[in-house]
């Protein structure tokens, strides 16, 4: 039936994922184009370490949103690590410094050091996207995620961070209580807010991210794969892990299928793919599976993206 339910006006975030090389960015671009054609204001965002939105739409891109197609409210943004770290420092830098400087005398440059810690970039990426969605500037955000392993780690981080905060709050507060008693003696700074208030705000942020990504009414996850052994195995793994994290996976795109058995090579490929499609159907029981045939053309430029968009949202193969 195509990706019909993605066009629901209540949907605010469409996450497009899969392993590298399966056409994930192409599918995300086609989905974003269709939603823009539906009259919605759309941001197509890529967090892939090697983004290709600029190549697909044949338009230069930098660290600001740019209009991708004339006549439509379709904008694109390729988010680099530098952008994420810069915005993280703007949002959390003062709070981090307030906490750390209450214990020790440090320069504000210490915030840069904290920003390089493992997981910071991924955690803030989710916060950045949720803020984009809830800010109201766009009707819907289509997120071309990084390859599978990176994305799974990213989506687990808010839960892990929240568990750490809940377990660590007592320790932090005990230490802070002791320091409060000797502040005058050692000339430690008094913060404008209590440490507990800052920690609680971080906990609330993680809960907000978790709730949003698990909200099946506003968030859709589209998984892109190929009909080969590796694609099937990774699809099974991703479906299981995403379900374990409470994420709604309602749509699967099987890409690069051979349409016709017009030569021995295509005959063998098609037979192999049909076998794996049956396996994928078993894995995706209850979900919408859309098949996408391999194009003889490079997918770049509005016309080719439009062809893919039509194929993804049409009722038949």
Q: Which sequence ranges carry the predicted segments?
A:
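Pre-Walker A segment
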Residues: 197-200, 204, 209
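Electropositive phosphate-/nucleotide-binding environments in soluble metabolic enzymes
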Residues: 123, 203, 274
């Amino acid at each position: 039936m195509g990706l019909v339910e993605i066009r629901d006006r209540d949907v605010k975030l469409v996450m497009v994922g899969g392993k590298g090389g399966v056409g994930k960015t192409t599918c995300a671009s086609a989905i974003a184009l269709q939603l823009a054609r539906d009259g919605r204001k759309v941001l197509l965002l890529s967090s892939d370490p090697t983004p290709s939105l600029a190549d697909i739409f044949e338009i230069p891109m930098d660290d600001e949103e740019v209009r991708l197609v004339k006549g439509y409210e379709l904008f694109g943004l390729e988010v680099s690590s530098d952008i994420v770290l810069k915005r993280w420092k703007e949002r959390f830098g003062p709070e981090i410094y307030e906490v750390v400087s209450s214990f020790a005398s440090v320069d504000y440059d210490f915030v840069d050091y904290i920003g390089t810690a493992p997981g910071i970039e991924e955690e803030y990426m989710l916060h950045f996207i949720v803020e984009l969605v809830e800010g109201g500037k766009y009707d819907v955000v289509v997120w071309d995620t990084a390859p599978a392993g990176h994305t799974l780690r990213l989506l687990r981080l808010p839960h892990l961070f929240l568990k750490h905060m809940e377990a660590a709050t007592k320790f932090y507060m005990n230490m802070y209580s002791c320091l409060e008693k000797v502040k005058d003696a050692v000339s430690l700074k008094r913060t404008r807010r209590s440490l507990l208030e800052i920690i609680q705000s971080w906990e609330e942020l993680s809960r907000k991210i978790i709730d949003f990504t698990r909200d099946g009414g506003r968030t859709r996850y589209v998984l892109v794969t190929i009909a080969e052994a590796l694609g099937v195995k990774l699809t099974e793994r991703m479906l299981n892990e995403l379900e374990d994290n409470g994420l709604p996976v309602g749509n699967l795109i099987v890409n690069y299928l051979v349409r016709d058995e017009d030569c021995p090579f295509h005959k063998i490929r098609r037979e192999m793919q049909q076998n794996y499609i049956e396996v994928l159907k078993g894995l995706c029981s209850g979900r919408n599976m859309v098949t996408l045939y391999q194009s003889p053309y490079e997918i770049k430029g509005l016309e080719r993206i439009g062809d893919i968009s039509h194929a993804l949202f049409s009722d038949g193969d």
